Amino acid sequence: MPLNLLKTYNSLLELDSFSESERNISLGRIFHRDFIETDNFFRNKAVKPTPQEGKTTIEILFHHLTTHSEGKYHHRVYDRDRSMRIHWIKFHLQEKKADTIEVFSVKDKQAVRTYIYNEKESYIVVLEPKTPQYYYLITAFYIKGRNRYKIEKKRNRKLEGIY
């Protein structure tokens, strides 16, 4: 399990041989290192977990970054592709390979969202600017299926600046 802590971008975490409990411990260690032990920033703005009334924001963020919504009632289930790339989020927030990512903002139905899009790796980090000082980390995921077309539509509607 500790070997996953040594993984860097763009390697994938090794999770398939773990039981659910072992997998959660391994992912939890990486999450703790990347989101609890250190503060995150994107372009000099703090990146915070999205609050949800009555719940611990860090636990919600961990659950959201390792699961996806499924079915009519949007029940969340383990997402192997998201989980194997959880350590990619910090790398993208830091824009370590700026030449491989595109950053753009789009006005969606609810709010303006800022996207950090890595087309080569089919990966995206979604932020919501809340104030001039910070963003909420909405989600991050491996893009597959119809999501690729959704992202392309968003790119075509991108705003002039980055919010």
Name each model-derived stretch:
Residues M1-Y163:
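Ribonuclease/tRNase effector modules and their secretory precursors
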